[in-house]
Amino acid sequence: MNEQLLENLIKQDIESIFTQILIKHNYIFPISAKSRSGAEISDYLEDGFVEYITKNPHERIYNPKDAPKGATKNPYDFCFNYKHPESGFDDLIWGDIKATKFSYADSNPDLGTPEKIIKFIMDGHFYLLFVFLEYEATEDNQTKFLAFEDGRYVHCQFLKDIHHSVRINPKPQFQVNIHEPEEYRTRDEFLKLFYTKYKESIDRNIAKQEAKKADLDSRFDSMLQRLKTYNDKINHDH
């Protein structure tokens, strides 16, 4: 099995599991569908993923884990090992759940820091998988999941296949509109895109800092004049 077929199989397996979790709950979670309820939804789904694999052992997925509760800086929402003997593949994969409120049609969620990805690759791994879902609030303020335009409730996408419009923002975090389609590329091609986007981000930050630096003399000259006025006022009052 070639690289792309294996990646498609991984996505199909994970999509199937999360879809089964939604079906079990009739596509409704007892969570208040606030604008920022994504983290609570993620916790619910992470637990559901681990529980599902534990109760329904999978021929290719093993050692499922969810993120430690309360750990805001955890590098993944859930993770698992995936083995496919025919391809000689057996590796750790990180999962990141992105549940977005339907009213936010142009949502551009943060998709992880560059340094997190670099460390993951340097540790001998590669695949970060996003699980995209959309939801809305029910009349009794619960969370109801919605089907995407293609009728599916769950979209899985590897970071490596992210749309080329992705940018790395000043935080820095990968960022792209969730409705941009995925674009298949090889692992090597992703590394080239990653390098280009990270360099562009750093260059933008340098340009901003250089502009601030260039403006520093005039700003402090202005403050010095203000301070002289202030000192004169204080001395005059006394």
Mark where each language-model region is.
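Nucleic-acid endonuclease domains
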Residues: 1-74, 80-93, 99-238
